[in-house]
């Protein structure tokens, strides 16, 4: 039920969700919040006989920041037996080939969510055994959140990584994480959206972990910046949305390669075979 409501809220500019027992918390920029739209949505939910109540309040960025810095101690996450993601104060951190430190500060991308975890696994496979590693390998990470995907790509061998995040506070968090991992010389973090693309730079690999509506709206920009034979990996949508994503990508000249899903969250991979 929570997944259905989250999917219906996404077009209303809600981009982050968390569930606690019988409560769904949804987050959107304050200037995008519309109580009338939320009320209309809840009045039309396809759940008969179920009563919903809701409330809203504005969350101060500094409060979240302080809370995370003081309390977050998430368990280390192991991805594909090769990558360990952990916080600054995580305990019992195992040794892995790729060690990544993340201070999430409420930004999306600690590696816990199915979309992030699956993309991390795909990045490991993309660079497996030195494959695709070269002095010219470039990666674009759209909607980078904590920049964990960009950081792993750089760790695996990408020589140049560009990470773009629309939220200025989240972009600052991404920059902090890049510095924490000693990758300031490899990763450039910018605040903005797909309008920053199209400057002539081409990428071997484009990662986009956002949401269905943004992916559909901006996919042409991602593809325009791919090198010949480049790879596009997208996530942030449900498995039932795959036909829509696939149709859009193929209409733009991309070749569908494969997809995978975990708890209905899906990653789709396409190739710009020219």
Language-model features, listed with the residues they occupy:
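Conserved SAM/SAH cofactor-binding pocket of Class I
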Residues: 106, 110-198
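S-adenosylmethionine
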Residues: 121, 129, 166-273
